């Protein structure tokens, strides 16, 4: 999957069910660490709430290693799982949901909880705007100052992201290139520079 949808902005949806107040927060989170930090932030904002339940599709929609959820004290399977199911049904990636519950004194039962938590996320999803995220591979490229304009023109043509620039004797660039344009960008860059400019895959740790 080279492209997928991610949330463009955060949303909040609130409803009251049998005197319990449910507040659903949705936000773009990139990776499980970011998702857990979002959960912690909402918990801090609502210290008096009874439960802060959480679910996340923190990577690509198809990446099962980037899924997470918590019932946070609710009966097992009544909160985090229905929240996660709603997120997965949206086909969005890099998204987290936190549902805060202020208990109103009336028990909802397991079925009622599943509906409350799952529906809160579903309703919030109707409010969210999304945008396309293009997966990019990182490459490094060294060029001199006279070649920079050519590189910039081709980056614009092929929608290549210039992620960093280091200006020393030469210019050291880190480029993010989508899978479908790597070959064409690399070929034209090499051709127009008479073979002097060649992108190299950025190794982990560089």
Curated annotation (Swiss-Prot):
Native source organism of the sequence: Haemophilus influenzae (strain ATCC 51907 / DSM 11121 / KW20 / Rd)
The protein's name: IMPACT family member HI_0722
PROSITE patterns the record matches: UPF0029
PANTHER family listed in its UniProt record: IMPACT FAMILY MEMBER YIGZ, IMPACT-RELATED
Family: Belongs to the IMPACT family.
Pfam family, one: DUF1949
One annotated GO biological process: regulation of translational initiation
InterPro entries: EFG_III/V (IPR035647), Impact (IPR023582), Impact_N (IPR001498), Impact_N_sf (IPR036956), Impact_YigZ-like (IPR015796), Ribosomal_Su5_D2-typ_SF (IPR020568), UPF0029_Impact_C (IPR015269), UPF0029_Impact_CS (IPR020569)
Single annotated GO MF: guanyl ribonucleotide binding
Any one Gene Ontology cellular component term annotated for this protein: cytoplasm
């Amino acid at each position: 999957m080279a492209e997928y949808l991610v949330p463009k902005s955060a949303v909040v949806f609130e409803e009251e069910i049998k005197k319990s107040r449910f507040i659903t927060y949705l936000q773009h989170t990139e990776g499980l660490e970011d998702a857990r930090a979002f959960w912690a932030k909402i918990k801090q904002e609502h210290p008096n709430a009874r439960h802060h339940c959480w679910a996340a599709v923190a990577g690509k929609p198809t990446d099962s290693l980037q899924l997470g959820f918590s019932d946070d004290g609710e009966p097992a399977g009544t909160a985090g799982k229905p929240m996660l199911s709603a997120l997965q049904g949206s086909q969005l990636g890099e998204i987290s949901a936190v549902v805060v519950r202020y208990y109103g004194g009336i028990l909802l039962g397991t079925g009622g909880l599943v509906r409350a938590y799952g529906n809160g996320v579903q309703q919030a999803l109707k409010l969210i705007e999304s945008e396309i995220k293009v997966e990019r591979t990182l490459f490094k490229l060294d060029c001199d100052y006279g070649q920079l304009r050519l590189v910039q023109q081709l980056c614009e043509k092929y929608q290549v992201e210039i992620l960093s620039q280091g200006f020393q004797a030469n210019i050291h660039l880190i480029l993010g290139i989508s899978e479908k344009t790597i070959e064409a960008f690399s070929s034209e860059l090499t051709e127009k520079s008479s073979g002097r400019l060649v992108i190299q895959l950025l190794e982990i740790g560089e």
